[in-house]
Amino acid sequence: MSAADKKPLIPPSHITIKIKSQDDICVYFRIKRDVELRTMMQAYSDKVGQQMSAFRFHCDGIRIKPNQTPNELDLEDGDEIDAFVDQIAGFSHRH
């Protein structure tokens, strides 16, 4: 096969991302690489019945901002995002 016959490797325009909760509940989303993750974050929040502001989303230990895209984060098909519930109040122990 000549070099002219080889097609360049073009990544697919969509990828599947798994969002995993602290309770090990997984929700899968198919998203475009160049669309802000805000859409997926909002859809996840709606699916679990919480406001988006109640969650922190992380990938490989790095917090994800809603305006970032999969391309900016180098996300690949099958990658996992962790969804953590923000703690609203602390605990105070008084004697």
From Swiss-Prot:
Which cellular component, as a GO term, is one annotated location?
cytoplasm
Q: Where is this cross-link: Glycyl lysine isopeptide (Gly-Lys) (interchain with K-? in acceptor proteins)?
A: G90
Query: What subunit structure does UniProt give?
Result: Interacts with SAE2, SCE1, SIZ1 and MMS21 Covalently attached to a number of proteins.
State the protein's purpose: Ubiquitin-like protein which can be covalently attached to target lysines as a monomer. Does not seem to be involved in protein degradation and may function as an antagonist of ubiquitin in the degradation process.
Which PANTHER family does the annotation name?
A: SMALL UBIQUITIN-RELATED MODIFIER
The record's comment on protein family reads: Belongs to the ubiquitin family. SUMO subfamily.
Entry protein name? Putative small ubiquitin-related modifier 7
Which species does the entry assign this protein to? Answer: Arabidopsis thaliana (Mouse-ear cress)
